């Protein structure tokens, strides 16, 4: 069961295993939910817009087969923590993320701020850098040249790790966003579940491909399983062939 709050966020009040069926039910049920929020409960344009942003944020995460929905929130593997922070910043939606053992819990009913997400991203990226740099001969205390080189590297890492702004284009216009989401939710209910799921995936892939993912398409695809387009040259990034061509 899906619950809308007055703040415009989406909640789930039962325990579910993430599955094709759940994805299809939530996606196809969203238009009716939005209609009821507007006509029956009198949600205004701003609240509807926040609902759509929340839906745009949480829907791809529901396609992650390695997680589940619980009464405390959306549970995903801990190694996806970094990508979830990036995705929240891109969408402009910032539910609290709690680390519990080997999982993270996205607490959909506990909103935080973009500043909190940026701070956590900086902490995670800095910790990763320090762990990778441990034991290197050109550490921070080796000499001034090494110190400056490491400082520049860390600053560049931090700058790259944070999206500059929320999703633009489609997200910038209320009517466009709502219409596009409703169109993406359309699917024939009289066809098998697998076909419904594939059709919805293609519809939403087109929708997300219109958004500015700020160079994070590969991370988004790894996090959500959505078939987001990646420029062909990006597949060579860091590969042996790329290094050979650069020499």
Curated annotation (Swiss-Prot):
Changing residue 76 to F: Complete loss of systemic RNA silencing suppressor activity. Keywords: Host-virus interaction, Inhibition of host innate immune response by virus, Suppressor of RNA silencing, Viral immunoevasion. It holds the Pfam family Luteo_PO. Changing residue 87 to R: Complete loss of systemic RNA silencing suppressor activity. InterPro entries: Virus_P0 (IPR006755). It comes from the Viruses. GO terms for biological process: symbiont-mediated suppression of host innate immune response; viral process. Residues 76-95 form the F-box-like domain. The keyword Cytoplasm does not apply. The F-box-like domain is required for suppression of host RNA silencing. Belongs to the polerovirus P0 protein family. Suppressor of RNA-mediated gene silencing, also known as post-transcriptional gene silencing (PTGS), a mechanism of plant viral defense that limits the accumulation of viral RNAs. The P0 protein suppresses local PTGS using its F-box-like domain to mediate destabilization and degradation of the AGO1 protein, although not via an interaction with host SKP1A. Participates, together with the proteins P1 and P7, in the inhibition of the induction of aphid-induced host phytohormones. This could play a role in the attraction to the infected plants by aphids. This is Suppressor of silencing P0.
